[in-house]
């Protein structure tokens, strides 16, 4: 079955779609990973937030990510977060498909992600490099990573 790729600005997100995205994120991050944290962080409906997801013909969300535009120090940068895939849909390239779609939109701008440590190799395949020390977020090791924009100096 081929999932449709959806991309929607926060302001255009309908209630059903938002519910399905949040439901999947809670399934993965809160239940599966046993991290009782507030998934609703206030950023899903910000004007500069875009949501990407894959959806089956019957409307089931199988994979999602959130792309946010930030302006750190006056510089436009993007941040990818909340990338997750439904347990029974893993291993089929869905995360890579969403990452490619989001990064196509990012274009030549820098993009950041706080990657779960075991996923750093996957993000490296998309041009991300380590950009700081490993840290714990809700008990899970994470690594800050950066995909430099054009003209940016890559870090080792």
Swiss-Prot record:
PROSITE patterns named among the record's database cross-references: GNAT
Pfam families (alphabetical): Acetyltransf_10
Superkingdom as given in the UniProt entry: Bacteria
Designated name of the protein: UPF0039 protein Mb2876c
Family statement drawn from the similarity comment of this UniProt entry: Belongs to the UPF0039 (ElaA) family.
Domain N-acetyltransferase: 8-150
GO molecular function: acyltransferase activity, transferring groups other than amino-acyl groups
InterPro entries the record matches: Acyl_CoA_acyltransferase, GNAT_dom
Residue pairs linked by disulfide bridges in the UniProt entry: none
Entry coiled-coil feature ranges: none
